Curated annotation (Swiss-Prot):
GO biological process: angiogenesis; negative regulation of viral transcription; positive regulation of transcription by RNA polymerase II; regulation of transcription by RNA polymerase II
Xref: PANTHER family: TRANSCRIPTION FACTOR CP2 (PTHR11037), UPSTREAM-BINDING PROTEIN 1 (PTHR11037:SF13)
Taxonomic placement: Eukaryota, Metazoa, Chordata, Craniata, Vertebrata
Induction (free text): By HIV-1 infection of lymphocytes.
Keyword Nucleus part of the UniProt annotation: yes
Gene3D superfamilies: Transcription Factor, Ets-1
Protein name, as recorded: Upstream-binding protein 1
Localization: Nucleus
Tissue: Expressed in adrenal tissue, JEG-3, NCI-H295A, Hep-G2 and HeLa cell lines.
Bias type Polar residues, positions: 320-368
Assembly: Interacts with TFCP2. Interacts with PIAS1, and is probably part of a complex containing TFCP2, UBP1 and PIAS1.
GO cellular component terms, semicolon-separated: chromatin; cytosol; nucleoplasm; nucleus
Superkingdom per UniProt: Eukaryota
Amino acid sequence: MAWVLKMDEVIESGLVHDFDASLSGIGQELGAGAYSMSDVLALPIFKQEDSSLPLDGETEHPPFQYVMCAATSPAVKLHDETLTYLNQGQSYEIRMLDNRKMGDMPEINGKLVKSIIRVVFHDRRLQYTEHQQLEGWKWNRPGDRLLDLDIPMSVGIIDTRTNPSQLNAVEFLWDPAKRTSAFIQVHCISTEFTPRKHGGEKGVPFRIQVDTFKQNENGEYTDHLHSASCQIKVFKPKGADRKQKTDREKMEKRTAHEKEKYQPSYDTTILTEMRLEPIIEDAVEHEQKKSSKRTLPADYGDSLAKRGSCSPWPDAPTAYVNNSPSPAPTFTSPQQSTCSVPDSNSSSPNHQGDGASQTSGEQIQPSATIQETQQWLLKNRFSSYTRLFSNFSGADLLKLTKEDLVQICGAADGIRLYNSLKSRSVRPRLTIYVCREQPSSTVLQGQQQAASSASENGSGAPYVYHAIYLEEMIASEVARKLALVFNIPLHQINQVYRQGPTGIHILVSDQMVQNFQDESCFLFSTVKAESSDGIHIILK
């Protein structure tokens, strides 16, 4: 019996030893020498880095940092850009911080830099029409600015400038070595730029963008150093506080698992450094692209915004100049310009004194050069589009359709430019046709007969009528246009009469002119006045 128990112990001991030996080999091939978790994470399937980002060894350090003292929204998902709500007209501090490492950019040590703060559109589809959007806002809010600088509250800023032609930008100089804070006020609200305004619309987002420049060798602040921006929405006074509270209450109702997908609300908003790329295409290239496809994809602007593109400054700053409006550019041409200012004495916008059309003088010709096209734009009050059409000749401009011009210039200016290109005049309120009889030197008599024929005079020659276009339906306008068309000195015309029944003469009054039928035909003659050296005109 003892032998049997001993054999059982030996067998059990052997089994345990064999089992331990078999377990000891598991995982040996997965040791540190053969397997590394970092190598697995480096595989392409796990790697989702943006190829445009710098590698760890060459991480760029931004020279400046801008912090806006306004809380971010808690209703923004983790990987989305922060969103900050602002109240219209309220002052918000932007702290301008020197973030350079020791030895970085020694050329600006002890020197001032210039920063331009702007409010721009976040959506690229609105950026394409930014000029027209801002012009429309200016029209509805005359005398107001989209962005202002609260100078009394600001600290460390020097020589602030605002240009009347750039209502969405302010600029100033500052010393990076000193404490600097700029207080800004945004006066436009997000719902002012929504296409349909019936109440309850979702307002469009804006961006607060800061661009900083240093001096070049000529002392001009043109060398770009840094740009950063953040996304905002602007509400009517106290509206931002209510929206922030609403977002916070919505987040409190979410489960803990859902909250993990959202960013926390931060007390301040850090403007994110962004790369510069041309967010607004060259106008010509853009129009050429639109010729085959008129609309942009619905997510086009949003996808670009998420990638972190930065809007270029309006005009590359060339010098730190005062904010007085710059004079309109002038152009010289070796040839005589094909455009001319309309004659103020013409009987209609398209007619000279003799009735000949002067359309050829006003209308831009297909052969017009680029310089002549620029002159034509200036003379026809399209100076704000001279830069947009800087490479357009007369033929290029005339090829644009009405729809093209409306998309480029907006509805109001687009239609006006189209009408100017097609030389469309204002439709006259009244048109009459007048033919002159042989002048008579007899004294005004009570009985005069009308011409025997409406188409021929006594010699059988056909009557030739001239068109008189009346923009004002008054008697003095009739006298002025008759004098202009038939080369009669206006001061010599005493009265204008209309021959009535039985040959009586009726004084032409404003009320009579207003009752003229459109395209009426008249013969007229002149007789000497009895009491002066003037003449009377008789319409028959």
